[in-house]
Structure formats: structure tokens, C-alpha cells
């Protein structure tokens, strides 16, 4: 028989890229005769790399139990049996969309599972700061139309959001003059600033750390508040003047780049923003929660009132931002089974463990040697879906590039739920 492509929807004018925090919708995807997916429109290396991991040809990946190919029914039954025998499951990875997150929450409630994302520590950084002191947020639209001063904390945010400055209109006529500052940048950031400098109306500046990032942020906060600082660096004094004179200043950072106890840095920036808002306008945007983790946290919050690192246990709903850290639970032997979800990026694989493990995700994760493996469709590639954007204020629809032969995660999880006693 001649192998045929699954029904392709390439060339549609609407395609939302699910592979970074910005959820850009300015490109389309083309499917060639070999089934390869290529990006057309706005170029993005991140999206192109991700698309190379997919094909419009029917996948050969099959469910597995203990490394042996089986039917979906058999894999679902094995997963349900494993979870039923577990006294404390951990749901990790959490690379999925809204419908997958809703199904995960239902299964977590039934099994008493603790849920934490693959980069849970980075996700908790801003959450803990908000829980302790409150936060100031903004949106990409606000930054695009109003911000005349953008301060990047700990480097530019191009690792997780490659097109950040383009999405924010830096160099466009919406804001005639913008100044971009990087505090504690690297050589990569110098290259980004050099490129920004060539855009109309854009000036740039790089400020080295004064000791470490904690000290630098604390010094900046004190200067903005008008407190005396002995031997304050000239560069920070100049930045304070710019902040006070700006029409709308925005601090931007990637939480995964922050050191341990990074919530203190976020609190310091929030304190600075609060002081500035007494006389002008300022806000902060912390980028994190990629691969669907931010979306899952949003969904868990609206369903239960609690974010990730929570569980529905014998004492009711419990939230422990420190004790329910997945890495800590694994290291201390506090859980006895692992369900790992990674539908967007096969490189986000489950940690090495001797625990019974269920893996639901990209077909390439078949090599993870899980007790149970079920390949599922990726939202925005083989199936539709929804994700929250980086700023957390907008949920965007994802459109399928082709009709997948793999099941959606939500349907697999619902079948496991029905089969779990």
C-alpha cells in the first residue's frame, strides 16, 4: 500500500504557535509531499525547530506496557491499575493545554495526586512573591502601546520568548522613542542590544551587576524610594532618573534565569514598581510557565482556588509551594508513582527513577522506558486546543495543522479516570 498523508490543514491563515510563551499567530505552516512541516511568514527559529519534530504522515508510535507494544485499551487499563495501587502519585511535566489540564485535575482529585510542572521552581517564583507581597502585572498590548522604558532584569527574555521585542513593537511608530536597559546581561544580551540599537527610535544600555542580582535590585529599590545609599553606582542613579521620568516603565525578566530564592528579586522589583506608581506609571512582566505549565496552573487555580503544588488529599485541598516540589518529593522518596505529561516538547522527558511511571506525550517519548507509555496528539499540531499567553491575561485558540491519528490527552485521561476504581 502507498502511505498517504493524514488530512492536512496547512496554508490556513490562522495558526497559533504553541511552542513559546508568546503564542504568535503571524505565520502559517506548509506540509510538503514528504509530510514535513515548514514555517512560512514571520521567521522563528524556535517554531522551526519544534515543527521539525512532527510529521503529517501517520505516526508509527503505539502504546506500550513495560516496553511491549499493546492496544490503547490495554495501556489505559495498565495505567489505571498502577494509579489505583499508588498511595501517593505525582503528576509531573504537565505539558498540555486547557482541556488536558481540566482532565488532569479530575484525575488528580480522584487519586490524591500532587501536581508540579517540569519547571515548577521557576513557576513558583512569581507565585510566591504574589502570595507574600502582591504584584503588579501588565500585558503585551500595554507594553507595545505605552512602554517607553523597558528594563530587562538578569538578561533579555529571548530564551523563552524569542520574538519578545517584536511583539512589543520596539522600533515601531506606536511609541516614537524607547530605551531598553539590561541589568546583569551576558554576551548573548549584548548581541540582542546591538540589533535593537539599529531600530528607529531605540536606544539601549547595559548595566553590570553591583555584586549580585539581589544586591543590585535592593540598591535600585532603595534609590527609587529616596533612601540614602553609600557609594551608589552612577549607572543605577541614572536609571532611577529615567524610571522617574518615564511615561510607562516596564521591568521584564525570565524566572528560570533567576538564582535560588529568586522570589526575593521579584519582590524587590515589585517594591520598586509600587514606589514608582506613586508619581508615574510602571509595571512588571515575569515570563515563565512554558510548555503549557502556566496554562495548567491557571486551570487548576480556577477549578480549585489553588495553583500547582497542590493536592486533594485526606485533609482536603492542600497547597505546599515548598514541600510539594517534584524534585524534592522524588529525592525524599515521598511518592510511589509518577504520571508524566509532555505533549509539546519531547526533550522535556521524565526524570530517571525506579518508580512505576506513566508517560503521556509526544511519540518520541517512547524511548523513556516507562511502565506505561501512551502517545498523544499535540495541541496546535494534530489537534485544536487553548493556551494562556505569557502575560496570563489572554487565552488563545490553537488550530490543528493536520488531523492526527493519535488521541487527545484529555480523552486518554478521562478513560483512565473511568477505569480507576
What does each model-found stretch correspond to?
Residues 127-280, 313-421:
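Non-catalytic alpha/beta scaffold blocks inside enzyme catalytic domains
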Residues 1-221, 255, 418-421:
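N-terminal export/assembly segments and adjacent metallocofactor-ligating motifs
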Residues 42-43, 287-289:
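Short, solvent-exposed aromatic-acidic interface loops
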Residues 279-287:
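Flexible, glycine/charged-enriched surface loops at secondary-structure junctions
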Residues 296-314:
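Active-site loop ensemble at the mouth of alpha/beta enzyme cores that anchors a bound cofactor
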